[in-house]
Amino acid sequence: MAYTNSLLVSYTKLSPNHSGQRTHSIDRITPHCVVGQCSVETLGNIFLPVSRQASSNYGIGPDGRVGMYVEEKNRSWCSSSNANDQRAVTIECASDTTEPYAFRDVVYQTLIKLCVDICKRNGKTKLLWLGDKAKTLNYNPKPDEIILTVHRWFANKSCPGNWMYA
């Protein structure tokens, strides 16, 4: 499959923290909360050191701009799960620093636009949220579907925060 990157990106700083080309086609999107109102430039700097051992495909700053840190063809190191990251486009979103880790409206609206863009470029017509870890991880998306997953299903974290569940 030929992978493309989002044209919504206004800032790029590629991180060395990735596993190279994916071993699974894209059929998941995993949004995250940054736990801070980090700009796309700050996120790029956070993901730059090899010692960080973390990255995401995209980030959305508090102003709604989109940054790219790992191209979609490559697996980011974002959700504490190799299996999830191999098939998910991962998106860090600027958020409040305390639970429920709310996103500003411009961040949320940009997240929606980015999800739609990812779906369209990958030939998907349905974005699914099942809300249940077992159901989601056991679900085999149809060729026209992408399913949402969350970081808290793979690590002892609140991410993406309870605001996303409201």
For each feature predicted by the language model, list its residue ranges.
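Short C-terminal domain-edge/linker segments immediately following a structured domain
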Residues: 60-64, 88-90, 120-125
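N-terminal catalytic cores of peptidoglycan-degrading enzymes
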Residues: 1-85
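Basic/polar, cationic surfaces and motifs that engage anionic cell-wall
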Residues: 2-12, 18-23, 97-166
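Structural preference for beta-strand elements that scaffold enzyme active sites
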Residues: 28, 88-90, 147-149
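Cell-envelope and extracellular/periplasmic
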Residues: 35, 72, 82-100, 116-120, ...
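A broad "ordered helical/assembly scaffold" signature
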Residues: 71-79, 87, 116, 125-127, ...
